[in-house]
UniProtKB/Swiss-Prot annotation:
Subunit note: Associates with the major light-harvesting antenna complex polypeptides of the PSII oxygen-evolving complex.
Compartments in which it is found: Plastid, Chloroplast thylakoid membrane
Alphabetical GO biological process terms: response to water deprivation
Domain of life: Eukaryota
Induction of its expression: By high illumination, water stress and abscisic acid.
Lineage: Eukaryota, Viridiplantae, Streptophyta, Embryophyta, Tracheophyta
Principal cellular location given in the protein's record: plastid
Tissue: Expressed in leaves.
Keywords: Chloroplast, Membrane, Plastid, Thylakoid, Transit peptide
Keyword Coiled coil: no
Family: Belongs to the LIPC family.
Protein name: Light-induced protein, chloroplastic
Length: 326
């Protein structure tokens, strides 16, 4: 049936043949006989033959496919033109939006600033300008109504809060650095945990505060700190010291200590396992002044900009975001 269906789709023209002899009429033609030319049988046959060979026949291809047995006519046959090539048009790459470009520029400007501590005045001005532009294009103008976006761990990438600068400057102490400052938010329990991780050649430890927050406006939350936590030092069983450290502008050679470190390597390994198994130290925060408010001025799924007391600004990036990669 597929062949019949295909044949029915071939266009055909009906050839009308005028008979050489016309039926007699009651009226006599006024035209002279010499002015009327009737084609002969030979000319008529020649005309038919020429048209038959000069008009090319359409080509078609029938392809057998599985079809429903209930369909008595079978599937429709797709006509394929000779020499046709199927071309799949690929969509052009999506151009980044203005917000994405601004976020990328901001991340590039933050690189090497040590969370703002080492930023020059020119870099600070550039960062402030980019922050202002992003705040004007905030995709979530009421962040407290989109609390699920606040969920998760946020890494501090930049701040102008001078109260954190003494903490950040501890990274300049020999063998000690601030590895990470983060804020973890749980919108279901309305809790916030601020954490600072310190790292050294012998161990890593953390200091955290747990707090509750309340929504006060579409952009503002009130935070009350309730508990402090000193994490158990996680000692490393493989101690690696640098060749030298810089302290107060002078380089101190640490090579004499390498022999001592090697001799106590096995002891440190056993101590690390015993200390790391101890629970962290927790203490309540009873000071009534241990509270603050936070205003979120920009929020999406990977970037958050907040402003705190005295106009200080915080730029935080969601853990796992490509913006954290230099």
């Amino acid at each position: 049936m597929a062949s019949i269906s295909s044949l029915n789709q071939i266009p055909c023209k009906t050839l009308q043949i005028t008979s050489q002899y016309s039926k007699p009429t009651s009226k006599i033609s006024t035209l002279p006989i010499s002015s009327t030319n009737f084609p002969s049988k030979t000319e008529l046959h020649r005309s038919i033959s020429v048209k038959e060979f000069t008009n090319p026949k359409p080509k078609f291809t029938a392809q057998a496919t599985n079809y429903d047995k209930e369909d008595e006519w079978g599937p429709e046959v797709e006509q394929i033109r000779p020499g046709g090539v199927a071309v799949v048009e690929e969509e052009p790459p999506k151009e980044p939006s203005e917000i994405e470009l601004l976020k990328k520029q901001l991340a590039d400007s933050l690189y090497g600033t040590n969370r703002g501590l080492s930023a020059s005045s020119e870099t600070r001005a550039e960062i402030v300008e980019l922050i202002t532009q992003l705040e004007s294009k905030n995709p979530n103008p009421a962040p407290t109504e989109a609390l699920t976006l606040l969920n998760g761990k946020w890494i501090l990438a930049y701040t102008s809060f001078s109260g954190l600068f003494p903490l950040l400057s501890r990274g300049n102490l020999p063998l000690v650095r601030v590895e990470e400052i983060s804020q973890t938010i749980d919108s279901e329990s309305f809790t916030v945990q601020n954490s600072v991780v310190f790292a050294g050649p012998l161990a890593t430890t953390s200091i955290s505060t747990n707090a509750k927050f309340e929504v006060r406006s579409p952009k503002r939350v009130q935070i009350k700190f309730e508990e402090g936590i000193i994490g158990t030092p996680q000692l490393t069983d493989s101690i690696v010291l640098p060749e030298n450290v810089e302290f107060l502008g002078q380089k101190i050679d640490l090579s004499p200590f390498k022999g001592l470190i090697t001799s106590v390597q096995d002891t440190a390994s056993s101590v690390a396992k015993s200390i790391s198994s101890q629970p962290p130290i927790k203490f309540p925060i009873t000071n009534n002044n241990a509270q603050s408010w936070l205003l979120t001025t920009y929020l999406d799924d990977e970037l958050r900009i907040s402003r705190g007391d005295a106009g200080s600004v915080f730029v935080l990036i969601k853990e796992g975001s490509p913006l954290l990669k230099p």
